Amino acid sequence: GSEMCIRDRPVGADASKLNVLDDLTDVTPAGSNARLGESETTPGESAERQLQYDIKYPYDLSHEKVSEGDRKLAEAMTMVADGPALAVLKDIYRRQDVLELVGVHSHIGSNIHDADAFIQAAKRMMLLRKTFYATDAYTLPEVDLGGGYSVAYTDGEDSMDIDVELGRLADAVSTVNRALGMPAPVISFEPGRWTVAPTGVTLYRVGTVKPVELSGEAKDKSGNPVTERVYVSVDGGMSDNIRPALYGSDYTARLANRKGSEQTKLCRVVGMHCESGDIVVNEVRLPADIKRGDILAVPVTGAYGRTMASNYNQALIPAVVGVGEAGAHVMIRRQTIDDLLSWDVSE
């Protein structure tokens, strides 16, 4: 959805998601008995805090779990400039005693390959900015156009060409503001996943290796008939990377501890959690001689891996090791059973 970025002068509360307009009056700054709809503040509080107002699109932009901006975006975005968003801006602007309105933010989806959808969203945001200026004579100084830039997780996929596509987006923003007679805002982008995903590699130790005969109608992801799939279990899974189970995200894997046989077999790398959806890599060809104790490397796990890791089934979250020209060092230590037990409350 699109979000209104506002900053509240009272300090102390964590960032909050406001899902309905009425919530703006229901947030109480820490250390104060006042609500944001009132003018009372705690003496000495002056730092800014960011709040966000979500505007949910009433459309499925592409995928039921991970939206990718597409042709439905233009229709869905009409609400941004034509109704709810403008009403929210006006309501916030009327509360200048406790709120400072600094800009608008949009998020249109994830793993988007080019700037086309971002350009559509940007045009709507600039139109919203112009409409608000025309009615309230206030120029929103900042516009955050979000992120969701695609990353190549498997062979054959492409990452977004940031230089080319963000250049197109910046040109479009300049063009539409000239056409609207508006000064260009400060533009922000969010390239987090695009930046950090390729920097992470997760290492797993192989456990049981089990070949399973498939029916005569079975095919691989390329459509080729297959008669056997080898299930390769590892000592991790959905507790350290929830994306395959949550979104159906695809990854690949490589044998990392030795050179395997030239002959390969179709494999599915599965986790240790005894869940049908606990899949690390849905389909990959690995050396036919893969065996217990081998190390598999799953690349491009630097984003939404460790940050969404959990103690599912009381699994321990693995360590994070930084590797550079100067060598390797532990950045985050491995969890232990004592860590889990430390949360227990003794009588």
Place the predicted regions along the sequence by residue.
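Short glycine/threonine-rich loop-to-helix capping motif typified by GTGT followed
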Residues: 113-120, 152-165, 196-208, 281-286
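Generic structural signal for well-ordered, non-membrane alpha-helical segments
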Residues: 81-85, 118-122, 162, 166, ...
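Glycine-rich beta-strand-to-loop/alpha-helix junction loops that act as flexible
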Residues: 108-109, 143-150, 189-194
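C-terminal helical cap(s) of enzyme catalytic domains, especially alpha/beta-barrels
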Residues: 24-29, 158-166, 316
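Charged (often Lys/Glu-rich) extended helix/loop segments that serve as interaction or gating elements
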Residues: 174, 178, 182-347
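Active-site-proximal beta-alpha core segment in soluble small-molecule metabolic enzymes
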Residues: 7-142, 172, 177
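Short, small-residue-biased leader/transition segments that mark boundaries at the very start
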Residues: 1-6
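A glycine-rich, aromatic-flanked flexible loop/lid motif
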Residues: 97-99, 140-147, 227, 261
